């Protein structure tokens, strides 16, 4: 897929990872095959695509330039409830956003940004197609999501790199105030499903790395 993109367009500017597998149930009711599928699609799939794309963000002059958008949530404990197996993968995707952003900063790649996006309300998609008809009033169209993605791609690196953002909140920050146009059912008021405030994942010792270890310099890997 990446090779075909480069062959056709000669460059890569943006990666949006929107693939996903979903299974919401307790641990006892989440069989291993479901768990493994979600990890392969959500976590391994993301990691593999990012690894394949990264070299193509390097420019001919040695600088790096590009944007990566990942569909994964802010990290908070309520998200784990009733869907632990699913949450393990989606939160892992958000960890990649945080960690890769740190890589960009440490390596001086000041024109690279990776950002996670998640819906503030339920959005019309394959994941919501089985909702009861009377619940359609709580859905927004996918346009709210795509509009937010476009704004993230255009935003300054320092504004979005390493951020775990909600579509509505980011659009409001960018000056959007009319959200009725996104409602699936005219005149409805979709219920917000995400918290208003999220925990700060940083610690006082955030910049203290201790003795930094680079496994690539410790000899040949046994894998």
Question: At which residue positions do the language-model features occur?
Answer:
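Conserved mid-core segment of classical short-chain dehydrogenase/reductases
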Residues: 21-36, 55, 59-63, 82-85
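Catalytic loop of short-chain dehydrogenase/reductase
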Residues: 58-108, 118-123, 129
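Amphipathic alpha-helical dimer-interface segment in Rossmann-like NAD(P)H-dependent oxidoreductases
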Residues: 7, 41-63, 101-106
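Rossmann-fold scaffold of SDR-type NAD(P)-dependent oxidoreductases
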Residues: 12-20, 42, 70, 115-116
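Catalytic Tyr-X3-Lys loop
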Residues: 21, 28-47, 69, 93
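Hydrophobic positions on the long internal alpha-helix
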Residues: 1, 16, 48-53, 57, ...
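Short alpha-helix in the Rossmann-fold core of NAD(P)-dependent oxidoreductases
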Residues: 39-46, 50, 81, 89, ...
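C-terminal helical subdomain
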Residues: 116-117, 133-222
